[in-house]
């Protein structure tokens, strides 16, 4: 840990030097980014204003297809979704890289935090935190919105694999073509999502799905009657 701490201190000192006296354009960009990030007074003054465009997109969601498009648009800003995606070597064919699809969408560390009694205090603190964030974002009745969002997230967690299952190299290796992926979540149009995210079709032409049953469970939650909860969750 000493090496990690020392390395982070060195990186910080380099960044601070860039902020104080940048010698070239790239160093100035680094310094400006750091200075902007550390300007807490300006951040507090701005409030939720920088999020206004994204919040408007979420407010406008009126159907599952609309939510799919919005999730794709937000993906370009690295906004987390209920599906995780990354590119990595193919365990079955290390000579190539392939897209991996994984379960996602939880604010707490893993699914056990939503069901085990030992985490009740953490769940209550999490609910209070979500309420505070929604209030700061100007959401009407943030307590009710937080309840809906966390109730939905708890349902999402019920379909997550536990940590032991996620470490199983064989169970989490499920190569699929795009058509097979689509069959797991018929309500989630991957083509609509990829177009909005500006992801090339080839990226999802063939994938490895880590937790297939999670996607089939997710499908049961992609319903019109849960749209209000999805909007609250996305905020």
Predicted features by range, described:
Residues 1-15, 167:
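N-terminal mature-domain "stem" immediately C-terminal to a signal peptide or N-terminal signal-anchor/transmembrane
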Residues 15-235:
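Noncatalytic, helix-rich "gating/capping" subdomain that lines the substrate-entry/channel surface
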């Amino acid at each position: 840990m000493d090496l990690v701490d020392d390395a982070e201190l060195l990186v910080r000192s380099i960044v601070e030097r860039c902020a104080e006296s940048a010698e070239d354009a790239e160093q100035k960009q680094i310094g400006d980014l750091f200075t902007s990030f550390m300007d807490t007074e300006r951040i507090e003054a701005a409030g939720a204003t920088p999020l206004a465009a994204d919040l408007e997109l979420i407010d406008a969601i009126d159907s599952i297809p609309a939510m799919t498009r919005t999730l794709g648009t937000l993906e370009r800003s690295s906004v987390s979704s209920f599906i995780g995606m990354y590119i990595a070597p193919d365990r079955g064919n290390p000579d190539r890289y392939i897209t991996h699809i994984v379960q996602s969408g939880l604010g707490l560390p893993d699914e056990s935090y939503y069901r085990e009694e030992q985490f009740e205090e953490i769940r209550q603190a999490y609910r209070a935190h979500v309420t505070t964030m929604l209030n700061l974002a100007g959401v009407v009745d943030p307590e009710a919105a937080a309840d809906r969002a966390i109730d939905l997230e708890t349902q999402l967690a019920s379909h997550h694999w536990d940590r032991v299952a996620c470490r199983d190299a064989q169970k989490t290796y499920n190569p699929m073509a795009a058509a097979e992926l689509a069959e797991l979540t018929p309500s989630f149009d991957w083509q609509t999502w990829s177009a909005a995210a500006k992801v090339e079709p080839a990226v999802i032409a063939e994938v490895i799905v880590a937790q297939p049953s999670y996607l089939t469970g997710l499908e049961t939650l992609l319903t019109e009657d849960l749209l209000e909860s999805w909007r609250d969750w996305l905020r």
